[in-house]
Amino acid sequence: MKTLEKKLAEDFKIVFSDKELLETAFTHTSYANEHRLLNISHNERLEFLGDAVLQLTISHYLFDKYPQKAEGDLSKMRSMIVREESLAGFSRNCHFDRYIKLGKGEEKSGGRQRDTILGDLFEAFLGALLLDAGLKAVEAFLNQVVIPKVENNNYERVTDYKTALQELLQVDGDVLIDYEVLKESGPAHAKCFEVAVSMNHEKLSSGTGKSKKLAEQEAAKNALEKLQRGS
């Protein structure tokens, strides 16, 4: 397997000046915690920075591409692009999952393919790239990796899964649809929420996300898929 540095250079023409910064971006908290005595840095702070630069870059792209769209529509489109599932997909497409350093427990539990970890990794890489090479380098990378996917997948057709679920379930009359936070974890700047959706107090499904709203949408999406399968 190619080294991470070689892959970045060959596939994206990216060469990090600060090698430690790149290594930190690919170090999960579980790995750092298992090697506390070595005082290894993990990628949560870089993830915080990467999230901000991703939001900025995608917002700028959408603002320019869709001059007639209202703020609400642009916000929905951006949410679909930067949601956890999408970012994890971008990480996999770049084969970043092969290079992240995980703790033994996280590795055994399937962390290398977990959307939460891979989405955070993608943001951490963007944060590291911003610090090492600047905003133009981040924009160039996103133009290679994210923008083509956005244009091919037609994110203009944004689906509000909560509304779609409500419309589906209320065909047969009034029903009570409720969303409940099951779990809240992670540090203040990188929260993860797990939310359950129920109909008339009977749980349909659950979902996770970096905010309650995103977790609710994911729960509604999973419920729709479950109902469509007839299970």
Swiss-Prot record:
It comes from Streptococcus mutans serotype c (strain ATCC 700610 / UA159). GO terms for molecular function: double-stranded RNA binding; metal ion binding; ribonuclease III activity; rRNA binding. Its main location: cytoplasm. Residues 1-134 form the RNase III domain. Belongs to the ribonuclease III family. Homodimer. This is Ribonuclease 3. Coiled coil: none annotated. Digests double-stranded RNA. Involved in the processing of primary rRNA transcript to yield the immediate precursors to the large and small rRNAs (23S and 16S). Also processes some mRNAs, and tRNAs when they are encoded in the rRNA operon. CRISPR (clustered regularly interspaced short palindromic repeat) is an adaptive immune system that provides protection against mobile genetic elements (viruses, transposable elements and conjugative plasmids). CRISPR clusters contain spacers, sequences complementary to antecedent mobile elements, and target invading nucleic acids. CRISPR clusters are transcribed and processed into CRISPR RNA (crRNA). In this organism endogenous ribonuclease 3 and Cas9 are required for correct coprocessing of pre-crRNA and the trans-encoded small RNA (tracrRNA). It catalyses: Endonucleolytic cleavage to 5'-phosphomonoester. Its EC number is 3.1.26.3. GO terms for biological process: mRNA processing; regulation of gene expression; rRNA processing; tRNA processing. Pfam families: dsrm, Ribonucleas_3_3. Gene3D superfamilies: 3.30.160.20, Ribonuclease III domain. The gene is rnc. It is found in: Cytoplasm. The active site is at D51, E123. Keywords: Cytoplasm, Endonuclease, Hydrolase, Magnesium, Metal-binding, mRNA processing, Nuclease, RNA-binding, rRNA processing, rRNA-binding, tRNA processing. Residues 160-229 form the DRBM domain.
